[in-house]
Amino acid sequence: YRNGRFVSISKEKIPVEREDLENTFLWISEFTLEKEDRIIFFSDGVSQSGMGTAKMPFGWEDGAKEYIANLVNQYNDISAKELAHKIVNQAEKNDGYSLKDDTSCCVIYMRKPRNLLVCTGPPYDEKNDKYLANRVREFQGKKILCGGTTATIISRELGAKMEVDMNIVDKELPPISKMEGVDLVTEGILTLGKVERILTEGDIDRRREAGPAELMVRMLLNSDKITLLVGTRINTAHQDPNLPVELEIRRNVVKKIKFLLETKYLKDVEIMYI
């Protein structure tokens, strides 16, 4: 799918020798992909969905192409994952929410990598507060601030107003905040801990919750290159002898999140300590 339309691609028929089947062959195509191209392929459980109904006596057929075109034209940055899910869900709907055949769909989307910056914890040296703020301001991509002190530093250095958003709640976590120029502002170590648990459990799409941790996980999984900027200052205002332990907990949780994102979700992740 390219520039708002489906592109015809030449195919070559190649015979394949198999002992269990006669007259077996493959169709081979070669082509050069361009930025924003999408390759979409699916099983006949999709193309034949709805077969025998009054609306689709012969199945979905070309209606699937029309459905895909409408979706992509309306949401031109729709992810490969979301597009594949929507196609399969519509096929299930065509079959009266009871699929008649195995139904699979795969989408490949050629696009620029999506970058995400996650900042958690204040810099070790207060002189680096300005450096942290500049990193946030100049970063080309989505931005998450994880921790009240971190958010306060960015708000102060960039002159950005911050306000609590009570529309998104989680009984386990403090609410998120809103800040101009930042996509998500959350509490720190508790939120990171829940993010790690969700990534470990997997299957985020089946979770009904929509709290701070779930929002953060979805942003992580919708990104390709993720930078975790971890501050190493101990907040002396708390006067808590356990704070060095808390700092180590934050480091360990961030390392676990990095490991999960790289090994389980195939993300490109970098940790930077400041």
Model-derived regions, located:
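Conserved subregion of the PPM/PP2C metallophosphatase catalytic domain
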Residues: 1-267, 273
